[in-house]
């Protein structure tokens, strides 16, 4: 480890960027963050209007251990930084087409009563079995995926990966796994809609992701008082105390490459200024980075063709009065459940009857709205942008019974349709007409997500988390050619979501430190594992282990590819 401070430029002040920057500053690096917008947080930011506050993106704090851990690693705590986490109870109200609802809760007594009302006395026992399985998915994923890097196919041959591969059901969908425990269509829907957190259909999302249902049901849904951005704000403050420099309203035109050394040597700003650095980390959308900030390559083209998550039309409504029928988190499920997901993820369209999420931050935190009023966020999932040969986009179902528009994507009409559908659905199911209560409306469309945050195709959660888009198959945290160029954020390993990006910041920061010559006991937050006794495969020689891992890694890759391309396709 050199005594000379290495300089680091981080592109993008999203969660992954500010987390990685703070960690590297803690280790003594000189870090500068460049952000194109005039605010930090990326999608994890706030929108304000006349006393109303809205979370622009994430509004549910899950996997709290990663939030506590990063502040502990930085020598502080959420409490010390003024972040107060509020528990949302109930978790959700889930509304169905017949006007009935289901209340999700961490309270086992309430869940027992609600589940037995639908599936009888045996239903609760099966629910406990579902919790047991999802708990296993949770613990294995946290320790073997969210805390580990997967730089190559060889990584798939790790003993803990091989041992747990079929225990976490990556080759079955969440819907398939839930159907083994819940016998009614209603409860299957209740316990699978959460795959939307990954931007995926429950009929395609690997069963492993039931870990999200576990963290909600066991740990609860939390919300930072003052908005989700309070967490980002605290990380920014810690970073600044450690020496991180933030330069907002500073766009990056390209990552500069020294052809003589084959390394990144800084960035070129939008105004043409060159900023040098020893290390570059891009927390910008990964597909955007490869296609807009780096020299064009066939790999960049292939990334553009990868499966991505969905987009959304998001409404931010300032309501003139409190709407008591709505809790902090509300889900309205389409009657044609599978068909609505197929419209989004297979046809990349907007469903004629979408499922949608309604967040009322003022219900859990009254400071989100003026007294006597509510702030309401409605997120309607839609297909990501698809450009056709004429440069237009299509996005609304054109099936004969869909009520859709015969259009190459008239977004004004599509937004109007989404708004009308949401208002009509809520009027029918909860008996409240929101239309006359809306004093002000702000809208984010797929184009907003694309233009404001450089999200490829307006996909709000980056690349998909399908089986061939995770672990060693997901774009790596280090560029294959420019070894001092690294990546953070939703589309690299381990994946999307605020806690996952925070977990990823630890992975990439430790990778950078080790590449810079740090030993385990020199990493500020790491325990010294150099004296740990070796056993099992660790006793093998390096060359033997590499060959063994290579064989197993290749075998796993072949089996997964075969399943995905042959069996799943049929």
From Swiss-Prot:
Q: Where in the cell is it found?
A: Membrane
Q: What does the record give as cofactor?
A: NAD(+)
- Record key words, sorted: Carotenoid biosynthesis, Membrane, Oxidoreductase, Transmembrane, Transmembrane helix
- What residue intervals traverse the membrane? 547-567
Sorted alphabetically, the Gene Ontology BP terms of this entry are: carotene biosynthetic process; carotenoid biosynthetic process
Explain the consequences of disrupting this gene. Leads to the lack of coloured carotenoids and the accumulation of phytoene.
Q: What induces it?
A: The expression is subject to photoinduction. Expression is slightly induced after 2 hours of incubation at 42 degrees Celsius.
| One Pfam family from the record | Amino_oxidase
Q: Report if keyword Oxidoreductase is assigned.
A: yes
Q: What class of enzyme is it?
A: oxidoreductase
Q: Key word Transmembrane present in the record?
A: yes
Pathway entry: Carotenoid biosynthesis
Task: Say where the protein is mainly found.
Answer: membrane
List, alphabetically, the InterPro entries matched: Amino_oxidase, Carotenoid/retinoid_OxRdtase, FAD/NAD-bd_sf, Phytoene_DH_bac_CS
Reaction catalysed? 15-cis-phytoene + A = all-trans-phytofluene + AH2; all-trans-phytofluene + A = all-trans-zeta-carotene + AH2; all-trans-zeta-carotene + A = all-trans-neurosporene + AH2; all-trans-neurosporene + A = all-trans-lycopene + AH2
**What GO MF terms are annotated?**
phytoene dehydrogenase activity
Q: What is its EC number?
A: 1.3.99.-
Q: How does it sit in the membrane?
A: Single-pass membrane protein
Cellular component (GO) terms are: membrane
Q: What function is annotated for this protein?
A: Phytoene desaturase; part of the car gene cluster that mediates the biosynthesis of neurosporaxanthin, a carboxylic apocarotenoid acting as an essential protective pigments and leading to orange pigmentation. Converts phytoene into lycopene via the intermediates phytofluene, zeta-carotene and neurosporene; and further desaturates gamma-carotene into torulene. Neurosporaxanthin is synthesized from geranyl-geranyl pyrophosphate (GGPP) through several enzymatic activities.
> What family, per the record?
Belongs to the carotenoid/retinoid oxidoreductase family.
Name of the protein in its database record? Phytoene desaturase
Q: Which organism is it from?
A: Fusarium fujikuroi
């Amino acid at each position: 480890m050199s005594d000379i401070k290495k300089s680091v430029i981080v592109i993008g002040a999203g969660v992954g960027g500010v987390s990685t920057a703070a960690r590297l500053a803690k280790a003594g690096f000189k870090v500068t963050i460049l952000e194109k917008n005039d605010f930090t947080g990326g999608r994890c930011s706030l929108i304000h209007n006349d006393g109303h506050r809205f979370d622009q993106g994430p509004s549910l704090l899950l996997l709290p251990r990663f939030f506590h851990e990063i502040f502990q690693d930085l020598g502080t705590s959420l409490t010390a930084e003024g972040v107060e986490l509020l528990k949302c109870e109930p978790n959700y109200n889930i509304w169905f087409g017949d006007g009935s609802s289901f209340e999700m809760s961490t309270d086992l007594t309430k869940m027992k009563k609600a589940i037995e009302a639908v599936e009888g006395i045996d239903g609760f026992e099966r629910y406990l079995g579902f919790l047991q399985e999802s708990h296993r998915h949770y613990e294995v994923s946290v320790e073997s995926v969210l805390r580990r890097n997967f730089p190559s196919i060889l990584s798939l041959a790790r003993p803990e990966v091989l041992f747990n591969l079929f225990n976490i059901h990556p080759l079955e969908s969440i819907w398939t796994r839930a159907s083994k425990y819940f016998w009614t269509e209603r409860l299957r829907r209740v316990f699978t809609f959460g795959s939307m957190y990954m931007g995926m259909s429950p009929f395609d999302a690997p069963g492993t992701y039931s870990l999200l249902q576990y963290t909600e049901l066991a740990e609860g849904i939390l919300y930072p008082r003052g908005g989700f951005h309070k967490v980002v704000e605290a990380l920014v403050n810690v970073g600044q105390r450690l020496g991180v420099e933030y330069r907002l309203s500073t766009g990056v035109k390209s990552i500069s490459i020294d052809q003589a050394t084959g390394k990144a040597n800084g960035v070129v700003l939008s105004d043409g200024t060159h900023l040098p650095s020893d290390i570059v980390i891009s927390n910008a959308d990964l597909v955007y980075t490869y296609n807009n900030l780096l020299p064009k390559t066939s790999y960049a083209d292939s990334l553009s063709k990868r499966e991505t998550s969905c987009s959304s039309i998001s409404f931010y409504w300032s309501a003139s009065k409190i709407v008591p029928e709505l809790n902090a988190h509300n889900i309205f499920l389409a009657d044609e459940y599978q068909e609505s997901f197929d419209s989004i993820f297979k046809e990349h369209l907007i469903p004629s009857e979408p499922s949608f999420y309604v967040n009322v931050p003022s219900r859990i935190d009254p400071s989100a709205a003026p007294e006597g009023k509510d702030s309401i966020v409605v997120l309607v999932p839609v297909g990501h942008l698809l450009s056709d040969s004429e440069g237009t986009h299509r996005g609304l179902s054109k099936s004969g019974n869909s009520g859709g528009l015969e259009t190459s994507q008239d977004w004004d009409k599509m937004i109007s349709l989404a708004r009308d559908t949401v208002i009509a659905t809520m009027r029918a199911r909860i008996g409240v007409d929101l239309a006359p209560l809306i004093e002000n409306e702000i809208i984010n469309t797929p184009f907003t997500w694309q233009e404001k945050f450089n999200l490829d195709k307006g996909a709000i959660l980056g690349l998909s988390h399908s089986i061939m888009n995770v672990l060693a198959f997901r774009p790596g945290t280090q560029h294959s050619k420019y070894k001092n160029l690294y990546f953070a954020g939703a589309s690299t390993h381990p994946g999307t979501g605020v806690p996952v990006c925070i977990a990823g910041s630890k992975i990439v920061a430790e990778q950078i430190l080790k590449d810079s010559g740090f030993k385990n006991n020199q990493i500020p937050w790491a325990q010294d594992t150099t004296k740990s006794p070796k056993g099992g495969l660790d006793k093998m020689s390096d060359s033997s282990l590499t060959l063994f891992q290579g064989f197993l890694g290749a075998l796993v890759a072949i089996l997964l590819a075969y399943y995905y391309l042959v069996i799943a396709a049929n």
